[in-house]
Swiss-Prot record:
Belongs to the universal ribosomal protein uS17 family. Pfam families: Ribosomal_S17. It comes from Ehrlichia chaffeensis (strain ATCC CRL-10679 / Arkansas). One of its GO terms (biological process) is translation. This is Small ribosomal subunit protein uS17. One of the primary rRNA binding proteins, it binds specifically to the 5'-end of 16S ribosomal RNA. The gene is rpsQ.
Length: 83
């Protein structure tokens, strides 16, 4: 029973971010912000990273908040999809 539940669970990463670019066809750029503590100075620092994400129906615009999930490579740079 326990093994059956484990097969259904996904171990892919899910992140939340803001769409910063939606100019390309079926592709958006999503900026994900994280707050981390600096190891030496113990100060909270905001880290940002942009992800190239597959948007199948071109439904997202700049400023939208989206959830993205890891996926098999779709192109040379796209490894995330919108959920």
């Amino acid at each position: 029973m326990r093994e059956g539940k484990r097969k259904n669970m996904s171990n892919k990463k899910v992140l939340t971010g803001i769409v910063v670019d939606a100019k390309c066809d079926k592709t958006i750029k999503v900026m994900v912000s994280r707050m981390i503590m600096h190891k030496t100075y113990k100060k909270i620092v905001k880290k940002r990273k942009n992800y190239v994400v597959h948007d199948e129906h071109n439904q997202y615009k700049c400023g939208d908040v989206v959830k993205i999930q890891e996926h098999i490579p779709i192109s040379a740079t796209k490894r995330w999809i919108v959920i």
